[in-house]
């Protein structure tokens, strides 16, 4: 798999099935997106997970949690559209081991995919930042933004790995496109048509701050009018 070092979603990713194909794909990809990395291809049938960790200046884990990417767009692999908090301590420890080896400090986001050939969760990438989906763990009880603020202010952040399970976070715009493009639209669990629940939250909307949602949808509608931005969002 050929992947740009700087990108988002699945933009720029391509798959080479031979050394010759890799040599053919690399120059135009690098020319368009900049430096790239080459990774082993893992069949996308395996579940994808995110391990979110906060490490102090001594690379000790203060907060750690995991959520599963139940749906994502494009359906063959990309940014998540529905996430669910789960308990996978071995994935937290695997991410922590990698970050400690790097002397990590602050927020670390580790992406994993379970290889269906051997059942092992394997690292895809590490992001040194908050991800768009961090809210699912915040709603589950791990307030990463606040604890990172405390760490930056020289305070001692709370240390815990306790959080609520089966909390869902949905990104509705991309989930709508997923529904249009996925063959599993009527087989997915939980159902695509479940829009309300005490355990269900939205990335782009909150009753506690509704105007941000209004602003988001207004900008999204403007993007749909622009042909270039529309193609980028609906790639």
Positions of predicted regions on the chain:
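Phosphate-binding site of ATP-dependent enzymes
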Residues: 17-77, 83-96, 113-122
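Glycine-rich phosphate/pyrophosphate-binding beta-alpha loops
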Residues: 10, 70-74, 79-80, 127-141
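Conserved metal-phosphate-binding beta-hairpin within the catalytic cores
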Residues: 101-135
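Peripheral (often C-terminal) accessory segments that flank ATP-dependent C-N-forming ligase machineries
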Residues: 150-235
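A short catalytic or substrate-binding loop motif that flags glycine-/basic-rich loops and adjacent residues
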Residues: 7, 42-47, 103-106
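Conserved anion/nucleotide-ligand pocket segment
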Residues: 1-15
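C-terminal helical cap and adjacent loop that interface with cofactors, partners, or active-site loops
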Residues: 143-151
């Amino acid at each position: 798999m050929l992947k740009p070092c700087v990108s988002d979603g699945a933009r720029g990713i391509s798959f080479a099935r031979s050394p010759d194909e890799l040599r053919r794909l690399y120059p135009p990809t690098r020319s368009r997106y900049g430096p790239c990395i080459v990774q082993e291809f893992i069949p996308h049938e395996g579940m994808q997970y995110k391990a979110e960790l906060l490490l102090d200046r001594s690379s000790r884990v203060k907060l750690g949690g995991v959520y599963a990417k139940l749906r994502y767009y494009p359906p063959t692999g990309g940014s998540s559209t529905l996430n669910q908090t789960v308990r996978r301590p071995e994935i937290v420890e695997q991410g922590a081991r990698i970050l400690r080896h790097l002397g990590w400090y602050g927020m670390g986001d580790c992406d994993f995919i379970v290889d269906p050939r051997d059942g092992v969760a394997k690292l895809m990438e590490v992001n040194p930042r908050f991800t768009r989906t961090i809210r699912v763990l915040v709603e589950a009880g791990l307030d990463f933004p606040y604890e990172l603020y405390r760490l930056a202010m020289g305070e001692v952040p709370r240390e815990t790995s306790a959080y609520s399970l089966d909390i869902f976070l949905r990104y509705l715009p991309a989930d709508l496109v997923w529904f249009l493009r996925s063959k599993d639209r009527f087989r997915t669990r939980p159902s695509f048509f479940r829009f309300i629940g005490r355990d269900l939250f939205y990335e782009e909307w909150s009753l506690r701050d509704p105007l941000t949602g209004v602003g988001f949808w207004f900008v999204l509608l403007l993007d749909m009018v622009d042909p270039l931005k529309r193609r980028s969002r609906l790639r």
